[in-house]
Amino acid sequence: MVGILQADIFTNKTALITGAASGIGRGLALHAAKLQMNVVLMDLNADGLNETHSLMTECPSMIIHCDVSNLEDFSKAKEKIASEFGTVHFLFNNAGIFLEGRAWKADQKNWQRIIDVNLMSVIYGLNLFVDEMVASQERCHIINTSSMAGIIVGPALAPYTTTKHAVVGLTRTLHEDLADNDKVGVSVLCPGLVQTNIIERDHLGLDLDESSIDQHESAKNNAQWLADGVKEGMSPEDLATIVFKKIENNEFWILTHPEFVEVYETYANEIAANKNNLD
């Protein structure tokens, strides 16, 4: 993917942002609007979508109330986008939810829901849009939102960590699959703590059984740590500035929180140190 021109790659191009009703998705949408992109906002939360739209700089835009974890719903949304803007040039597969719990204690129904939202929605986005991006012969980019939890692990975060690791693996494979294409870039976004309401599930309209969520102390502690941490986290607007710069530079890894670099390095070194155990 070397050789992609560093021109004004954003203005008048179409950006689809899932999970746009709040948090990171809202930050990406506001930044895209400032760049005078055609901005498509997609989420289950209709009120949040309207609020995001009201905060945006005036630009060509559309709101689609959609469950991206449902392929039929997502496919219908694609038809609406095509009729209004044509090709999606920048695909932000950003929708996601948080669910804590130990690996053997998370309820099966809740497991399926977080897999559907955090992983299958990304897969559906790729299924629906990558072929037309390649065929367009225009500068395009795919950004899949993972997390620091897509690289490192902690206790009692099995559902979230599993899905976010899967997004990293999927995106790395996608990057390899498109390695010979000099038009379509690929990035995986792995942020640390950001000012979002991901820990607050009530507003999402999701069919989650709260009573079956793991009540072990470690699960509660991690959920509380995250709830406290996001209050002081990076602003979505600052994160979006980093993301768009990384896209412009065609960088695969988008790691927005330097305080986690040492943790990433320790994790990589642990893997490297144990390779000799296979001899």
Model regions and ranges:
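Canonical Rossmann dinucleotide-binding motif of NAD(H)/NADP(H)-dependent dehydrogenases/reductases
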Residues: 3-39
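The beta1-alpha1 cofactor-binding region of Rossmann-like NAD(H)/NADP(H)-dependent oxidoreductases
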Residues: 46-47, 65-76, 108
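Active-site helix of classical SDR
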Residues: 126, 163
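Substrate-binding pocket helix/loop in short-chain dehydrogenase/reductase
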Residues: 102-103, 107-115
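Residue(s) in the substrate-gating loop at a strand-loop-helix junction
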Residues: 147
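SDR active-site lid
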Residues: 179-253
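Conserved glycine-rich Rossmann-like NAD(P)H-binding loop of the short-chain dehydrogenase/reductase
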Residues: 35-51
